[in-house]
UniProtKB/Swiss-Prot annotation:
Signal peptide annotation: none
Gene from which this protein is expressed: tlcd4b
TM regions (residue ranges): 14-34, 53-73, 88-108, 112-132, 169-189, 214-234
Designated name of the protein: TLC domain-containing protein 4 B
Gene Ontology CC: endoplasmic reticulum; membrane
Domain TLC, chain residue ranges per copy: 44-243
Keyword set includes Membrane: yes
Main location: membrane
Localization: Membrane
Organism: Dictyostelium discoideum (Social amoeba)
Length: 257
């Protein structure tokens, strides 16, 4: 009973208060900043900007704690069964975010809902609940929470577009970093971690819980395919940007000639 109370006080309550406070106060803060800079703050921005900022907060906290948990905290003896207090907290934190985002995206579906996010959030919530909650595959799950490191770049891209800064050099740099981040972390890093467990870890061949092979054989391919789709979409966007810029420069040069 005491353990449950501690979990509520030191994990559930802070997570709930953080996301609730951000949801309540961020729109007002952003509106003040926008008005001071003579930027319109209409309905879409009132909904999307706070949502993106909260997404960024979640990504920074989750990825930073995941890096610490994976590389600066020697607890991983068995990649499929080892757990730590930090890994449990990370899954609790990101679960609260996904629940929050799912509710907000459903309520403001006109602006926020996408089928890709619905699929991603559903798979993530089921994995963190049934695997993470049972103390299974924390190492593998952390390799995914770590890849949230790319999310702030995606949100920055949205902010730059929304502020009409598509021609700013930062927009190009940001797009390239997103592409590299997705390929490096969301595709290769997670795949390398998964293959290491399957082929190099002795615990996989003797694992008896059916959730482990289900995660590796179904969840991992589904998330990877989704990440590959997003990577393709990003690369297509970058290619279109450079092609358009090149054509525009040629048109200007021809006019000058």
């Amino acid at each position: 009973m005491e353990t449950n109370i501690n979990v509520i006080l030191y994990q559930d309550l802070p997570c709930f208060l953080l996301f609730t406070s951000l949801h309540l106060f961020l729109p007002k803060i952003i509106e003040i900043i926008f008005k001071k800079n003579n930027i319109g703050f209409y309905e879409r921005k009132r909904i999307e900007w706070p949502n993106r900022i909260i997404s960024t907060v979640n990504a920074i906290v989750t990825s930073a704690l995941s890096i610490y948990c994976l590389y600066y905290n020697e607890w991983i003896v068995n990649s499929l069964r080892s757990t730590s207090e930090m890994s449990y907290f990370i899954f609790k934190f990101i679960t609260y975010y996904f629940i929050y985002d799912f509710i907000i995206s459903s309520y403001y579906s006109k602006y926020l809902f996408t089928w890709g996010n619905l699929l991603h959030h559903t798979i993530a919530l089921l994995s963190f609940t049934f695997l993470g909650g049972k103390g299974l595959a924390h190492h593998l799950l952390l390799s995914y929470t770590f890849t949230e490191i790319t999310t702030p770049l995606i949100n920055l891209r949205f902010f730059l577009l929304d502020l009409n800064l598509k021609n700013h050099p930062l927009y190009v740099i940001n797009g390239l970093l997103i592409f590299v981040g997705f390929v490096l972390f969301r595709v290769f890093y997670t795949s390398a971690t998964m293959f290491d467990v399957i082929f190099n870890q002795p615990h996989y061949s003797i694992e008896t819980d059916p959730l482990i092979p289900f995660f590796i054989n179904f969840v991992y391919p589904a998330i990877t395919l989704l990440n590959l789709y997003w990577t393709f979409y990003i690369s297509k966007s970058i290619f279109k940007y450079f092609t358009t810029s090149k054509n525009e420069n040629s048109r200007i040069k021809n006019k000058q000639d």
